[in-house]
């Protein structure tokens, strides 16, 4: 619940992405990773000594990072200061201290959050000696490492874990209610939707738990539904951070998404389903959260240009392969379909915690498998004789087979589709595992 967020900052080409990839690989060796996409280089989860945390590579979001203006780096660091619990500042021992390093260090010296100065490419005794120069940045002790070989990353991770702030567990009463987070790119209408939904200015309400650094649960009762609204937007918003890149909206969404049960993704009907929307949707899916998509400002769209059905179909193509998601057309301004939106969100919450008895699951799925068995591989037939839902927080299903290695992704998608055909898992990611019987 109280997952820590780590931001890796620094100028281009100092090894931020290599360090990020090394941290994420540690996690993938422990758990089954969600099928990756190219955006995995920006955000991932890691674990060290039993503590889980999320890692964001700020450099991964900068296009044309060979020629990034100093102002862009400054904005990234300011946002990391706002959003992260711990900041790793990566520098390059080969190049020594550069003017841009000094600019970043000047910003970081002003913050009270933990900052770990990580000197990269230190792989011999001479470079250990050269690294002493980085004391001049005024950030205290530093940690030397070599991101390519992995040397020194263990000490860096030990220091990282020690730097995590102590976070109180939320009150039990807050835990029992569904947690909904309203997410989306800037100016899509998130604030208008929240204010229309709760019928009051959200800054007036009383917080149940949390600090300005944490996602805050605020309890509401609307249309007969009790829920907690996970709110991070507005608490740390600063006008000086111009949110015009994918990085900003995604970074601002991370904590709310990780803290929520269901994410309400608000998109601007006048702009369509853009790259930032896709990234936030992917972030929710990767975290195995429920998702509802609200197409806001639908009242502003010329209806003769595109029908809601065409618009919805276009969005679903962008969501593939996870297309079983409720899409509603709303207007926060006129309060059109707000009740429907909340009802859909509550239903997704119920879908996410749905449990199917093993007997019923086998009765249906074994018939499905018998009608269309897995393709034979190398003259060998795959036989699945037993299946069940795992006792996990999110829907996960395991199928026991004699040759699990021969069951490929297309057949796993077929199994998922058949599960969705028979049970309502709309808005909820499903995991399918094939294990040896």
Curated annotation (Swiss-Prot):
<dbReference type="InterPro" id="IPR032859">
    <property type="entry name" value="KH_dom-like"/>
</dbReference>
<dbReference type="InterPro" id="IPR005225">
    <property type="entry name" value="Small_GTP-bd"/>
</dbReference>
<keyword id="KW-0677">Repeat</keyword>
<feature type="binding site">
    <location>
        <begin position="231"/>
        <end position="235"/>
    </location>
    <ligand>
        <name>GTP 2</name>
    </ligand>
</feature>
<dbReference type="Pfam" id="PF01926">
    <property type="entry name" value="MMR_HSR1"/>
</dbReference>
<dbReference type="InterPro" id="IPR006073">
    <property type="entry name" value="GTP-bd"/>
</dbReference>
<protein>
    <recommendedName>
        <fullName>GTPase Der</fullName>
    </recommendedName>
</protein>
<feature type="domain" description="EngA-type G 2">
    <location>
        <begin position="178"/>
        <end position="353"/>
    </location>
</feature>
<comment type="function">
    <text>GTPase that plays an essential role in the late steps of ribosome biogenesis.</text>
</comment>
<feature type="binding site">
    <location>
        <begin position="184"/>
        <end position="191"/>
    </location>
    <ligand>
        <name>GTP 2</name>
    </ligand>
</feature>
<dbReference type="Pfam" id="PF14714">
    <property type="entry name" value="KH_dom-like"/>
</dbReference>
<comment type="similarity">
    <text>Belongs to the TRAFAC class TrmE-Era-EngA-EngB-Septin-like GTPase superfamily. EngA (Der) GTPase family.</text>
</comment>
<feature type="binding site">
    <location>
        <begin position="57"/>
        <end position="61"/>
    </location>
    <ligand>
        <name>GTP 1</name>
    </ligand>
</feature>
<dbReference type="GO" id="GO:0005525">
    <property type="term" value="F:GTP binding"/>
</dbReference>
<keyword id="KW-0690">Ribosome biogenesis</keyword>
<comment type="subunit">
    <text>Associates with the 50S ribosomal subunit.</text>
</comment>
<dbReference type="InterPro" id="IPR015946">
    <property type="entry name" value="KH_dom-like_a/b"/>
</dbReference>
<feature type="domain" description="KH-like">
    <location>
        <begin position="354"/>
        <end position="437"/>
    </location>
</feature>
<dbReference type="InterPro" id="IPR027417">
    <property type="entry name" value="P-loop_NTPase"/>
</dbReference>
<dbReference type="GO" id="GO:0043022">
    <property type="term" value="F:ribosome binding"/>
</dbReference>
<feature type="binding site">
    <location>
        <begin position="296"/>
        <end position="299"/>
    </location>
    <ligand>
        <name>GTP 2</name>
    </ligand>
</feature>
<feature type="binding site">
    <location>
        <begin position="120"/>
        <end position="123"/>
    </location>
    <ligand>
        <name>GTP 1</name>
    </ligand>
</feature>
<keyword id="KW-0342">GTP-binding</keyword>
<dbReference type="InterPro" id="IPR016484">
    <property type="entry name" value="GTPase_Der"/>
</dbReference>
<dbReference type="InterPro" id="IPR031166">
    <property type="entry name" value="G_ENGA"/>
</dbReference>
<dbReference type="GO" id="GO:0042254">
    <property type="term" value="P:ribosome biogenesis"/>
</dbReference>
<feature type="binding site">
    <location>
        <begin position="10"/>
        <end position="17"/>
    </location>
    <ligand>
        <name>GTP 1</name>
    </ligand>
</feature>
<keyword id="KW-0547">Nucleotide-binding</keyword>
<feature type="domain" description="EngA-type G 1">
    <location>
        <begin position="4"/>
        <end position="168"/>
    </location>
</feature>
